[in-house]
Amino acid sequence: MMMMTRKYILFLLFLSIPVVMTAQDKDFGIWYGISAEHKLTKKLEIDLLTNVRTFRNASKLDEAFIEGGITYSMYKHISIAGSYRLTKSIENNDSYYFRHKYMLDLKGNIPAGNFNFSGYLRFQTAVKTYIKDENDKFPSYTGKIKLKAIYKTPTFPLNPYIYIETFCPMFSAKSGTIEKNRFSAGVELSITRHNSAEVEYIFQRDYQPHISDINIISINYKLKF
């Protein structure tokens, strides 16, 4: 088990090293998030979160959203979730418009000693209210995969983690390509049994319409009740 754990961590670390390419654009942003989750029953949980994201060297608002969802635990380590996100984001005309996003997840987690490995497969659809051309009138579909490894420090409230995320367009001319990747390393601070905070660094590479990179500092506060 320990050997498999080490191999898995090395695999994630390898994937978290961005491929060296010449990006046409490089940027920096800061993300701020607050989330809350509440167990309704042993198998049913509701979640609510809000997030504000900046770009252009953290000088301009990129998007802000609020999201609500529900998770059902089918088995001990497998669950399904559905959520809705209302976003106000900047568009090509430098003005802000609403977007509606609907998400369906299949989640899993595997504990291994002080480590916990988790991930999910997501199918999501987004609907724009900013219509620039004919394609904007129709929903866009995206598949997403996330893999995460966290080490639960036994005697200290700081838990380091890494994760990767990949986004792929679906049901379009761009199907079979990668839209963007995220590689992240961070630390979780356990404040109390029901409160925690996270600080993480994210490297995001967008491939469409051209290669562009953004370095992100993400700060999150989490509440469980």
Residue ranges and their predicted role:
Residues 162, 171-174, 178-225:
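Predominantly the C-terminal beta-signal and adjacent terminal strand-loop region
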Residues 50-56, 84-90, 110-112, 123-127, ...:
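Transmembrane beta-strands of outer-membrane beta-barrel pores
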